[in-house]
């Protein structure tokens, strides 16, 4: 599903890994700059200097941009800071991709979103009340939850988590770890790739494989 073949870009040198259907993996970083570089490669925003990046068996950069975008409709991304549109309310941010790409209405999204929030325990009620706020009025945790729910509504085959648990209190990080684990198991063959700082919080994240990128 995701394959790197001796990929080189800046400080990332000769990186190779292969994630098959159903895999979970975490990549640990010693610097956010290195993480941002790899995220750009995974998102198709940066072209490698050498090597190949394949999604679903297709070389990303052997395709024109339109074809590459079609591949990424099967890929979800949860940006570290939420990646929310500043002048749209949280609920509007959450719904926009599912409405645009899947034709999902607010009424149709209500049940799956409620199921996602149900896994968040005591914070669920407060989060629901906050869905009418703009992103700038939300906490980091709340922005991450909105970004998670937005990606999950698309039911992607691959989901890439960008420092999703970094900077959160232990209990909040643990809640999101449980949520992503449950979501991974909901669809046969789904791949979950976590980009993580090399710290104690990330050490608690269960994954089939771990890759460490450090100097």
Locate the predicted segments by residue.
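ABC-type ATPase nucleotide-binding domains, specifically the catalytic core motifs of the NBD
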Residues: 95-108, 118-121
């Amino acid at each position: 599903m995701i394959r790197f073949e001796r990929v080189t870009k800046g400080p990332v040198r000769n990186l190779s890994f292969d994630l098959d259907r159903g895999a979970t993996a975490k990549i640990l970083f010693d610097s956010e700059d290195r993480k941002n570089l790899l995220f750009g490669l995974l998102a198709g925003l940066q072209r490698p200097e050498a090597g190949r990046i394949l999604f679903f068996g297709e070389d990303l950069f052997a395709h024109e941009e339109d074809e590459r975008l079609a591949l990424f409709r099967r890929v979800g991304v949860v940006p570290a800071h939420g990646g929310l549109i500043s002048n749209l309310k949280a609920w509007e941010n959450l719904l926009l991709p599912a409405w645009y790409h899947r034709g999902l209405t607010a009424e149709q999204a209500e049940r799956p979103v409620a199921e996602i929030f149900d896994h968040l325990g005591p914070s669920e009620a407060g989060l629901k009340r906050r869905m009418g706020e703009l992103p700038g009025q939300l906490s980091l945790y709340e922005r991450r939850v909105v970004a998670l729910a937005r990606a999950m509504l698309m039911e992607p085959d691959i989901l890439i988590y960008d420092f999703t648990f970094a900077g959160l209190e232990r209990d909040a990080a643990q809640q999101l770890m449980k949520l992503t684990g449950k979501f991974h198991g909901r669809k046969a063959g789904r791949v979950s790739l976590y980009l993580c700082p090399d710290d104690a919080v990330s050490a608690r994240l269960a994954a089939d494989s771990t890759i460490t990128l450090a100097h």
